UniProtKB/Swiss-Prot annotation:
Gene encoding the protein: dpfgK
Practical applications according to UniProt: Diterpenoid pyrones display various biological activities and FDDP E shows anti-HIV activity. FDDP D and FDDP E show also inhibitory activity of 42-mer-amyloid beta aggregation that is involved in the pathogenesis of Alzheimer's disease.
SUPFAM superfamilies cross-referenced by the UniProt entry: S-adenosyl-L-methionine-dependent methyltransferases
Lineage: Eukaryota, Fungi, Dikarya, Ascomycota, Pezizomycotina
Function: S-adenosyl-L-methionine-dependent methyltransferase; part of the gene cluster that mediates the biosynthesis of diterpenoid pyrones. The first step of the pathway is the synthesis of the alpha-pyrone moiety by the polyketide synthase dpfgA via condensation of one acetyl-CoA starter unit with 3 malonyl-CoA units and 2 methylations. The alpha-pyrone is then combined with geranylgeranyl pyrophosphate (GGPP) formed by the GGPP synthase dpfgD through the action of the prenyltransferase dpfgC to yield a linear alpha-pyrone diterpenoid.
Keyword ATP-binding: no
Protein name per Swiss-Prot or TrEMBL: S-adenosyl-L-methionine-dependent methyltransferase dpfgK
Amino acid sequence: MSGSTLDKGKVTLTGAEETLLITLFARAKDAESPNPVLNDQYSAQVVSRIRDQGYNFSRTTLDRSDSSFFTSLVATRARVLDICCEQFLERNPGPATIIHLACGMDSRSLRLKWQGEGRLWIDADRQDVIKLRRQIMDEPAPERGEYRLTDPDIHDDAWLRDYNVPTDRPVLVLFEGLTPYLTRDEVVSLLRRITNHFRDSGVNGEIRFDAPGSISYFLINYVFNKPLRSMGTQFTWYMDDPRELETHVPGLKYRERMFVLHDYARLGNYGWLAGFLLRVADWFNIGGRIGSGYGYEF
């Protein structure tokens, strides 16, 4: 159906993989705004290149005539995770590894100054995503340190070993927009896999990710569901209590909510009324049921 709002052109991503284009488009819209939160100029370039392949980004905004709120939400989340990466590198100025799972078309490895002696950055995602990324995105310029772009099966118990991920330096594992499309058992197994791989070698590390709460789970699946439904997917997991994972993953310790709703109000561009309502939601302690970012250590 060439030229229709559902046209994908040459882009073959489907299901949860295609949803990465929703957040990519939001980051690009933020970069084009008068007062950007993230100001990810790379995303605008990537959107243009994907459009050249015939993809119609109307697929990502079917439910939003005015997407400014969602744009600010996505940009703020990305900015907070960028800050977490920067703080990890400040705490570990020597050799260190950063593993970005479900990297999609995110330019974090380009946005941040992570290179240094003994530094390793791994961007990882599914095979079809990595294939598209190689076609349309540049890799970080060669400097001190190492960059890898990989397509492991993160549900395979041996993937960290098979991809020769170092176990002799501090590690940060982060993923953004991944957990909503996993089952509870898959989330627990992934965290166990990561924790065991590094703890068995005596390596300390951090895991940071975002997760929807029960309120967001309901709203996305049953109210604002047109974009995901058109892509053939839905949310399959939510988390209201971040300490629950400690009981299922030995050695994993919950440390913090990385961003609460008033962080969105402080960093984002929502206007005074929306900002006030976000703060009120936190005062009544319902932020976790909406969704947040979480920091763990092992």
